[in-house]
Amino acid sequence: LAVNPDIEVLIECIGGSSGPAYKLVKAALNNKKHIITANKALLAIHGNELIKIAKKNDVTINYEAAIAGGIPVVKAIRENLKYNNISKVYGILNGTCNYILSRMEREGKDFLSVLKDAQKLGFAEIDPTFDIKGIDATHKITLLSSLAFDIPIKFSQTYTEGIDKIELDDFRFASEFGYKIKLLGIAERKQNSYEQRVHPCLIREDSEVAKVNNELNA
């Protein structure tokens, strides 16, 4: 596929940040083929290298499906918002975590019980580590940050905290003060630097983000 002269665009659906996906995409770019992928792990780990190869060979890497489900956020930043001096990007970037937090709050069920339900319904993987530890959301926010601020991808420098330590008492305390708990990915332009982080946040109940529940992103 990577060397076939009849192929102009390669769609990568293998997944994973290394192994065959990385080798195939790298080889295809070096052979002047455009790439379409939803593989945020691959881009978060190897994106800087792959983007450099793509530019050298005058081809593109397109990854709209890698971030925020059906929300066309990559296109919006690339074509419009990027030129408006973005100072901050934040949002709910992992539907599994949002589903678990929503049900814990609404039904008073503990984390492990809701996680098992999410796995049965297909909202969580058999091995949910990337989701519940915040790694999936970190892949996404580092890509968004790179787009929004035109900086290199900095996955390894992003603070990451998941939802696996959230307890029911946390929701009770948050509710008493008018807050909800959401796992957010946040990228922010500081005076002389950029900050990227993923962690559970207290969100005002009347905010738009607080109203996004279940498996939805925002």
Regions found by a protein language model. Give the residues of each.
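Rossmann-fold NAD(P)-binding glycine/threonine-rich loop
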Residues: 16-31, 38-79
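Long, structured protein-protein interaction/assembly regions in large complexes
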Residues: 215-218
